[in-house]
Amino acid sequence: MQYAVVFGGKSYEHEISIVSTIAIKDIIPGAIFIFLDGNRDFYLIEKADLKSNYFSSGNYKKSPKLELKKGGFYQKSLLKEKKIPADVVINLVHGADGEDGKLASLLEFFEIDYIGPRIEGSVISYSKLLTKLYAKECGIEVLPYQLLRKQDKKIIDFEYPVIIKPNHLGSSIGVSVVYDSSELEYALDVAFEFDDEVLIEPFIEGIEEYNLAGAKGQTFHFSKIEAVKKEKLLDFEKKYLDFGRSGEVKDASLNETLRLHIRNAFEKIYDPLFSGAIIRIDFFVRDGKLYLNEINPVPGSLANYLFGDFRAVLEDVAKHLPKSKNIVIDYRYINSIQSAKK
């Protein structure tokens, strides 16, 4: 199976996508790498050039430029164009473009097989508000929340401390913990720099957090469950480093009841909305009760470090991707009308 990894994108998480791709360059054998820059141009990148300064310096523009057309990516020359020989595209664009449905729409429009969230899954998981509404529809608890828009009065419904998050961003960008009213205005200003909507939740000290990745191919694949041990809040720089992980992690020490509860919740969220994607879901546990925190439709480094045999998972998903219905356009209705007029 020949994979083409698409990364970059016009996103606040552009650099994280680069780090994420560098981390997995040796994990997907023989992969082709396609960079989507801030102008939304595609470039074919040699594996040897997958270094952060290759992109920050602008040297990537010396790489061959690609065009996205029906069936795949193409490299043009003076006399001809050559199709890039990829069987399946892997969406590794974090944030906007990759997780909001733009790339999924393009790939589906041009009938290209890809591993990544489909349009509906992208739209729901890209919005923290829609994620919570979807989780509740699936019967999974979420923490209390309040949505605040720029034009709204800056009044919050919770006692302090609270956590403030841009509604459409990940990687801790624009996120603040607010301990009293004197800190509120500044935290909101920071969040509104990145988004027109923010989500406010109670900030609960000592809450347990667990991450589980998974995917569905011929069968369901669950990763190890990671117990997240971190500071009060991972800032962007720490998340930046976190996305570059590639070594395996230890499976969390959980009782079997909680382990099954987390897996069952994951499966309810995943199937069928995220078919064809490898996703990670972050859960909270408080007083023995499970809550969904966030859905990561394009997790850092595809969460490869959570799986015992990531390549086998990738191959199984690639072989069982969702297929669009073949709609036959035969103009039968128009032709029947024309025949009736004669």
From Swiss-Prot:
Binding positions (Mg(2+) 2): E294, N296
GO biological process: one example: regulation of cell shape
Catalytic activity: 2 D-alanine + ATP = D-alanyl-D-alanine + ADP + phosphate + H(+)
Residues given in the record as Mg(2+) 1 binding sites: D282, E294
InterPro entries in UniProt: ATP-grasp, ATP_grasp_subdomain_1, D-Ala_lig_Van_CS, D_ala_D_ala, Dala_Dala_lig_C, Dala_Dala_lig_N, PreATP-grasp_dom_sf
SUPFAM superfamilies: Glutathione synthetase ATP-binding domain-like, PreATP-grasp domain
UniProt keyword Manganese present: yes
Binding of ATP, residues: 159-210
This protein's UniProt keywords: ATP-binding, Cell shape, Cell wall biogenesis/degradation, Cytoplasm, Ligase, Magnesium, Manganese, Metal-binding, Nucleotide-binding, Peptidoglycan synthesis
Cofactor: Mg(2+); Mn(2+)
Identification of the protein by name: D-alanine--D-alanine ligase
Species the sequence originates in: Nitratiruptor sp. (strain SB155-2)
